């Protein structure tokens, strides 16, 4: 008896970070450079720069929009941008980065 199937890797945050950095993912989806300063929000109409990036005490990169209170990681940003749940966001990222 022969089984014909492929085992796909488990997609989680750790798996994604084995391949690219948080900065790479965040910059790709926000369309913004990851540096100090304020930027216009890519998620809503914004006439005054209100978005910044910062690192948490444990080193995670965070997107912070002072205009609407959004405070998310790169996965959270994808969830908000595409209006999907966590696992769907992981799948989108994995597919985009092949």
Tell where the protein language model's regions lie, with residue ranges.
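N-terminal structured subdomain of primase-like DNA metabolism proteins
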Residues: 1-98
């Amino acid at each position: 008896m022969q089984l014909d199937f492929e085992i796909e890797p488990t997609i989680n945050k750790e798996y994604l970070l084995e391949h690219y950095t948080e900065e790479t993912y965040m910059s790709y989806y926000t369309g913004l450079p990851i540096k100090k300063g304020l930027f216009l929000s890519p998620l809503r109409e914004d006439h005054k720069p209100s978005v910044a990036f910062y690192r948490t005490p444990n080193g995670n990169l965070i997107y912070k929009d002072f205009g609407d209170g959004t405070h998310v990681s790169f996965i959270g940003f994808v969830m908000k941008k595409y209006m999907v749940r966590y696992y769907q966001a992981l799948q989108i990222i994995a597919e985009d980065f092949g």
